[in-house]
Amino acid sequence: FFKQKTAYEIKECDWSSDVCSSDLTNEDFATVCDNLHKEGIQVVLDGVFNHVGRGFWAFRDVLEKKWDSPYKDWFHISFDGNSNYNDGLWYEGWEGNYDLVKLNLRNEDVIQHIFAAIKGWVEEFDIDGLRLDVAYCLDHDFLRRLRSFCDSLKPDFFLVGETLHGDYNQWMNDSMLHSVTNYECYKGLYSSFNSMNMFEINHSLLRQFGPDNWTLYKGRHLLCFVDNHDVTRIASILTNEKHLPLIYGLLFGMPGIPCVYYGSEWGAKARKEEGDPALRACFLEPEWNDLSDIISRLAEIKKNSEALNYGSFRSVLLTNRQCIFERKSEHERIYVAINADENSFHADFDAGCGTAQELITDTPHDFGGGTDLPGYSVAVWKMEH
């Protein structure tokens, strides 16, 4: 909801206090948040605390006053150099992008300015959390202070960070972030279908959540997705559109918090090389279809399942084109089955019971004599006790 000159010229206004739009007021946004809360929807804002645009008021003051600016230590600046814009000073930009001026997150005034903004958002809009842009760049001490501060505002305040590679535990732990983006499984999800190699995503899931003691993120809840605002939409990246319902079946069945990018619930298409406007298109109204129905049902199943939210992960059956895995909690056991092939597949495996309820279709299922998985199918079985 911030007013922007370009896709990257962010935070031109006083983002600590005002919704920056010519059409939307703070009162309007407070009403939006209130109505969302009444529908049981929590509001998580995008917090960009690593950098600001060149038009940010404090940086403009530095450009004007140089050494005499009280904000010169808000940024990583050298007055012995020069910038690409011939500013008469050098500054650090985010990953070499000098349209985005990196904030000094070890400066107490910067920290307090950010904290005051968050406090204002909680008090005025009652927000429920923050998604931290480029969290992998943020100072770890800052993240610890941010977690402590947000906990003091709201005990259940949610912090999720954008991370790409490496050990996610360095950001996701009891003193920093609650969750991070699971880019490892993002790649494994679409690649497993395009290469018809279910071993890839299964390997990642076992590495992250499997039954062995050494697995990386057991008990953690990573933000999982098949597309977002930075990557090609899943309907464009999959080589077989019949795999669309199946990949969402995997997304909602695997450990983690499933995230559906707006428009993708009906199969909107866009490629990264087409640029941000294509990836972040405006839709006049939803285009509800069969895919939307399946995703809606999967979301309902996930919401109401103890095992899918908190259960362990175990691989039951695995081939190049089929996989079955178990999610198990104290009171519930769920099997998720995927057949990515066009042909039916006969699966023989130990179900540990005789019957189950298939939750997508809400029909009983008998495991006697094995199970036939139709071509291009996903099943979610709630196993009998």
Describe the role of every protein-language-model region.
Residues 51, 114-140, 224, 228:
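Active-site groove signature of glycoside hydrolases
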Residues 202-272, 289-290:
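Substrate-binding clefts and catalytic carboxylate motifs of secreted carbohydrate-active enzymes
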Residues 33, 37, 51, 63, ...:
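Active-site-proximal helices and loops of the catalytic beta/alpha 8
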Residues 18, 30, 35, 244, ...:
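Carbohydrate-interacting/catalytic domains
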Residues 43-45, 130, 159-161, 181, ...:
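Hydrophobic faces of well-ordered beta-strands that scaffold small-molecule active sites
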Residues 1-20:
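Single conserved hydrophobic/aromatic residue that forms the stacking wall/gate
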Residues 16-26, 96-111, 128-137, 192-196, ...:
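The substrate-binding groove and active-site-proximal loops of carbohydrate-active enzymes
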Residues 16-124, 146-152, 169-170:
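Substrate-binding/active-site clefts of carbohydrate-active enzymes
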